[in-house]
């Protein structure tokens, strides 16, 4: 019998793609992963669509993936939850949204913020359309849209099409005006790069930035200058569209991590990320979902559904020690999301945050990111033998995959493979069973069949390799099956709420 110590290694963005020149994982030299697949039991997991609580065919993402992995169940995600509310009409009766619109009806403006795409990772354009319609139906006269352009979860120059759709929809209803445009690089930072948030804030609150009353022309001008959607510099399209004291602001993003910093800048009196030239006081500000447990003063339109009896909670309840480790870009995923969307740190749960490199604007310039530091700390912690369960994330294949730069993505994959080799050696030395897997695909499709760049996640299956135990695995599973598998390896019974099924074949 094994000692019951288990380590889960999540290779973020490491999907199983077609064996072609557009697949950075296939093109990379991966002797460690190759040898693991030859030597140890392995299977494939679904990490997208209905299998992770997303709409059918919708690509998975890190938040969704880690929530499903850590909770051991398929978790109905915010995207279909909100989309279903639009379909059944309850969205338009939402009392939190309604209160913000009531405020705007009393002589104030309504500002709708959000990532303008159908990528479905942080937002969905149909949710923004629904909010414009709700404002129209309630007779709100001054409705301004502050659009963050995507180019990351969708094609890099698809933004012009989304802007055109929104522009036409507003014209058709006679409600809504695009006030500002900007790449998500600015308004949706999550790593305290406050200069980016400041540029975004100054466009929306102060009216500062490129001045262009025609949003379609602004997009064309950006493309002509070689700047794709994600990096479009803040553009002011409506001089009268500034966010002013007392206005209503609704942030339509449902994923918290990239909505948090802008929300702090717009709403918190003690905000100190940068010196605000103008502070819009007493905003009626609505978060579509819970962006941060500390933001207790802000109403939430779709509050979280509580998840109990997650993997971390069960392991802690058995008096066992666990470790969560990742670099900044994925730290929230192995802690907050893995624990079911709560900041709770369980008894016996240690956390290690390795800073992501901040001196580079994009990760194709540093494809190794902080993987070696993560690996070094992880190996040192494994060698203590102190932990019964370890969860580690290597961010590279996802974060470098998002840049669309193929040579850098190959370097990222190879760096992760080298790190994995040292982790496997340490785990074998200390008697740990390893589960090596991914939360979704990304680097497995860097180039589309037509030759264009892909910067988004994929819907491909992801690998799961069981290292250290010769146990037969089911032919295919889904991410929610990982937690019950780990509990079985640790000789712990899962709770009834954990509806995933162990991947280990019953003899």
Where are each of the predicted segments found?
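Feature captures the catalytic ectodomains and active-site-proximal regions of enzymes
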Residues: 1-507
